[in-house]
């Protein structure tokens, strides 16, 4: 055993000599490493002491510990808040909730139903302004149904016109070609590309309203829902 210890000391001295020769500032580096090791050792001892304190059972029940002692043990700094104003009386809720809700509801402005429609629906007041000889047997619901189909077609057309070349399908391409042919026939008289002809709307209507489409156009022109432009045999309509 003594021979082993002697050989171990010799090997250690030989290694230290080699380190001193090859490592610059070996003594200062070794001293800093030693200090760091000692600091780590002290830190580990503190951690073990804290763990021992935590694991040890408290001599008294937790309910007997005061908040100050508990905060001090946990390392929590306690800040006192002064000059806190407490209201003398709490505002009471009205005993008439139904009336209050009605007042609040009356002050809320409801948004219009029209939104971003291309052709707005007809109001009852506008419907009454249409001459009786133009209306015939057409009702407000009939006209609004026709107006809804016009808006549906223009919305779809606007969506197709807004597509990029990559988004356009083969069917969309055929529809666009037909619209361009109609634009050529219009000879530049239309102020917008969102137009339609009678054949665009008729397939969207019911059989009964298809017969009334020609009679509904003068009514819609009267209240300025649609405008028309005649170019040869074709009549173009736009909002």
Swiss-Prot record:
Name one cellular component (GO) term: mitotic spindle
Record region (Microtubule binding):
116-239
Question: Where is the protein situated, by its record's location annotation?
Answer: Cytoplasm, Cytoskeleton, Spindle; Chromosome, Centromere, Kinetochore
Keyword line: Cell cycle, Cell division, Centromere, Chromosome, Cytoplasm, Cytoskeleton, Kinetochore, Microtubule, Mitosis
**Top-rank lineage group of the source organism:** Eukaryota
- Family the entry assigns: Belongs to the SKA1 family.
* Assembly, per entry: Component of the SKA complex, composed of two copies of ska-1 and a single copy of ska-3. The core complex associates with microtubules and may form dimeric assemblies. Interacts with ska-3 and microtubules.
Query: Under what name is this protein listed?
Result: SKA complex subunit 1
Q: Which GO terms describe its molecular function?
A: microtubule binding
The yes or no answer to whether the keyword Cell division is present is yes
Name the job this protein performs: Component of the SKA complex, a microtubule plus end-binding complex of the outer kinetochore that stabilizes spindle microtubule-kinetochore attachments, promotes alignment of chromosomes at the mitotic spindle equator (chromosome congression) and assists suppression of the spindle assembly checkpoint. Kinetochores, consisting of a centromere-associated inner segment and a microtubule-contacting outer segment, play a crucial role in chromosome segregation by mediating the physical connection between centromeric DNA and spindle microtubules.
Q: Please name the source species.
A: Caenorhabditis briggsae
What residue spans carry the region label Disordered?
A: 87-115
Example GO biological process:
regulation of microtubule polymerization or depolymerization
InterPro entries the UniProt entry points to: SKA1, SKA1_MBD_sf
């Amino acid at each position: 055993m003594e021979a082993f210890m002697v050989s171990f000391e010799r090997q250690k001295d030989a290694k230290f000599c080699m380190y001193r020769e090859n490592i610059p500032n070996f003594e200062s580096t070794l001293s800093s490493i030693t200090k760091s090791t000692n600091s780590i050792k002290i830190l580990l001892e503190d951690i073990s002491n804290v763990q021992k304190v935590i694991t040890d059972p408290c001599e008294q029940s937790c309910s007997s510990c005061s908040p100050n002692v508990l905060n001090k043990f946990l390392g929590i700094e306690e800040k006192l808040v002064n000059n806190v104003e407490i209201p003398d009386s709490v505002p009471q809720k009205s005993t008439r909730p139904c009336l209050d809700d009605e007042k609040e509801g009356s002050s809320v402005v409801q948004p219009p139903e029209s939104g971003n429609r291309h052709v707005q629906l007809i109001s009852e007041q506008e419907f009454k302004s249409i001459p009786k000889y133009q209306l015939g047997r057409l009702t407000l619901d009939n006209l609004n149904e026709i107006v809804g189909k016009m808006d549906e077609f223009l919305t779809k057309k606007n969506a197709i016109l807004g597509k990029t070349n990559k988004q356009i399908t083969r069917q969309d391409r055929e529809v666009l070609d037909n619209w361009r042919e109609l634009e050529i026939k219009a000879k530049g008289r239309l102020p917008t590309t969102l137009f339609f002809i009678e054949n665009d709307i008729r397939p969207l209507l019911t059989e009964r309203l298809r017969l009334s489409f020609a009679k509904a156009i003068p009514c819609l022109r009267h209240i300025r829902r649609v405008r028309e432009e005649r170019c040869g045999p074709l009549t173009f309509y736009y909002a």
